[in-house]
């Protein structure tokens, strides 16, 4: 537990479902974007996007579920587990035992059917990376992303202009089923990506979405500090500041948090805020 200094209070906010929103935006999943925009405008429980996802999973009319419906949890876990080509194993990380494998397989199939643009993105970004490695120097575009091989790196340029660099990329596999591998230091030392199995559409998509979400958080941090809110910590997509008692408001904090950068004007962004004498994540 973290306590504010005497005479001070903590104020914080976190983005709402930011990866789901960014994924829908990058892919151009129109119904999902409309669902978030509608909910942000109305805050009607029947418009809650995880409820809408659940309606599509169970093939019932929109508005059939609310935030109190148990089916909403299925919609939420589907979004968390399946957005990057995940299946049963990904599901089990979020919900270990309530449903059978056959039920989870059906959820996955229904989720993919209801998200055609996201499915298309997985394969498009994988193909774009492969073309960029084969044809070094060529800029290959995939939606708002630009990919290029240069100087021993595969460079994935995000909408913000920031680049994610993948060292020593190469194409491996037979002519019909090639994929890109690169050196990965995620474990603290450079090894072949995924033990030599290489990258795939879900991995590229996760990197893109996480990178964009990071850029949104970084720009929000700069705005918030410039407005006089000193940041004391951030956890995932949450920012926490310590301010003198009576300074600022959660309403202003949210406005600062969700202000859209010029490169993401069509991305629906929302946040929730809190204030109090102590911070406890649990």
Predicted regions and their residues:
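Conserved catalytic core of nucleotide polymerization and phosphodiester-bond processing enzymes
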Residues: 1-282
């Amino acid at each position: 537990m973290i306590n504010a200094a005497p005479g001070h209070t903590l104020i914080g906010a976190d983005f709402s479902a930011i990866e789901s929103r960014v994924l829908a935006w990058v892919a151009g999943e129109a119904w999902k974007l409309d669902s978030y925009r509608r909910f942000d405008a109305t805050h009607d429980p029947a418009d809650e996007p995880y409820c809408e996802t659940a309606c599509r999973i169970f093939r019932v009319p929109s508005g059939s579920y609310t935030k109190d419906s148990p089916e909403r949890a299925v919609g939420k876990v589907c979004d968390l587990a399946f957005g990057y080509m995940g299946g049963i194993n990904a599901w089990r990380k979020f919900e270990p035992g309530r449903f059978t494998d056959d039920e989870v397989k059906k959820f996955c199939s229904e989720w993919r059917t209801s998200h055609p643009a996201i499915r298309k993105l997985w394969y498009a970004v994988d193909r774009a990376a492969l073309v960029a490695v084969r044809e070094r120097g060529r800029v290959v575009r995939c939606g708002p992303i630009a990919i290029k091989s240069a100087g021993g790196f595969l460079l994935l340029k995000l909408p913000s202009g920031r680049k994610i660099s993948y060292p020593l990329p190469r194409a491996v596999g037979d002519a019909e089923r090639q994929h890109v591998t690169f050196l990965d230091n995620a474990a603290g030392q450079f090894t072949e990506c995924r033990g030599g199995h290489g990258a795939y559409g879900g991995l590229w998509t996760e990197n893109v979405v996480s990178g964009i979400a990071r850029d949104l958080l970084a720009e929000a941090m700069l705005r918030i500090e410039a407005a006089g809110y000193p940041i004391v910590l951030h956890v995932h997509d949450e920012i926490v500041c310590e301010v003198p008692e009576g300074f600022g408001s959660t309403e202003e904090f949210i406005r600062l948090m969700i202000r859209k950068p010029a490169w993401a004007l069509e991305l629906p962004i929302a946040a929730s805020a809190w204030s109090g004498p102590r911070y406890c994540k649990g």
